Amino acid sequence: MEVILLTKVENLGNLGDKVRVRDGYARNYLVPQGKAKYATAENIAEFEARRAELEKAAAEALAVAEARRAKLEALEPVTIASKSGGEGKLFGSVGTHDIAEAVTAAGVEVEKREVRMPLGPIRQTGEYDIELHLHTDVNATVKVVVVAEQ
């Protein structure tokens, strides 16, 4: 099935690209999320009429994400206190939700879905570099320090 992308989609294409995707991906994800429209003649004409508006909105979203990245990278290391046993092993773990809350408390709004932890949750005390995915083109790194709770 062919669709026209209304936003940049990671690993697929940019705004305005006409791409071929599987039917289920288009029907269940891209179209309901507002990321694409079916590539009919009518939709193509409508898209071309709105192209400048969509490009402006995409540029504004990118500028906002860049500003957030600058704030995040200027941030001091974020400290999270968690209960731990001997040798720095945590009782439980520190996950995306905990990190998002701590960074938000430090002064920059971050959602749980923006936190990337490819190695899974943190289970040891120590210093970690956590990547935040703010936009398809913008990533920021925040230093998180996990300490034992007193």
Curated annotation (Swiss-Prot):
Electron transport in keyword set: no
Keyword Methyltransferase (UniProt): no
Record-level GO BP terms: translation
Entry GO CC: ribonucleoprotein complex; ribosome
A single GO molecular function term of this UniProt record: structural constituent of ribosome
Keywords: Ribonucleoprotein, Ribosomal protein, RNA-binding, rRNA-binding
UniProt cross-references to InterPro entries, sorted A to Z: Ribosomal_bL9 (IPR000244), Ribosomal_bL9/RNase_H1_N (IPR009027), Ribosomal_bL9_bac/chp (IPR020594), Ribosomal_bL9_C (IPR020069), Ribosomal_bL9_C_sf (IPR036791), Ribosomal_bL9_N (IPR020070), Ribosomal_bL9_N_sf (IPR036935)
Family: Belongs to the bacterial ribosomal protein bL9 family.
Record HAMAP family: Ribosomal_bL9 (MF_00503)
Function: Binds to the 23S rRNA.
PANTHER family, sorted: 50S RIBOSOMAL PROTEIN L9
Name of the protein in its database record: Large ribosomal subunit protein bL9
Species of provenance: Thioalkalivibrio sulfidiphilus (strain HL-EbGR7)
